[in-house]
Amino acid sequence: QIEVIISDLRLDNFFNRVVQALGSDDSDRVRLAANYLATDLVSLLETHDEADTWHAEHFATLIGMLFDEKITSRIAKDLLKSVVFEGIDPQKAVIEGGLLQNDSKEALAGIVADIVAQNPTVVSDYRNGKQAALQFLVGQGMKLSKGTAKPTLLAELITAYIKEMKV
């Protein structure tokens, strides 16, 4: 990751501004920022090459929200372009868009019941030991929640729901 960043002066300068905004003493957040910068942001650079207009503070805020599990990775990736290149405030975008990560067991219970009911063959596959089936069900839950469900909690709830089901 770091090689990608330091090989491009624009990325290197932007990353330094992001580190400053994050507070360089938090190596886990810095590492997460480097990962998003070297993978997701690099792919957007062809159409946005004026690095001095990139919004490092907003990117740092977005990374902080992701790190603190206030948003999912999918939401972070969806907001990345508008946050960095258009200067959209990520906190405002998340709140106004209803994109905060949903970690309410009660709220997710309905989604879990729906996806299990809609996918009996996949549930059967999971019961027969196919782990990929669980990932499929989690994916369906993420789709129904519009990317706001906490994936690990969703997997946990689906597993528990299936175990409690009568065959």
Task: Indicate residue ranges for each PLM-predicted region.
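Charged, compositionally biased, marginally structured helical/coil segments
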Residues: 1-167
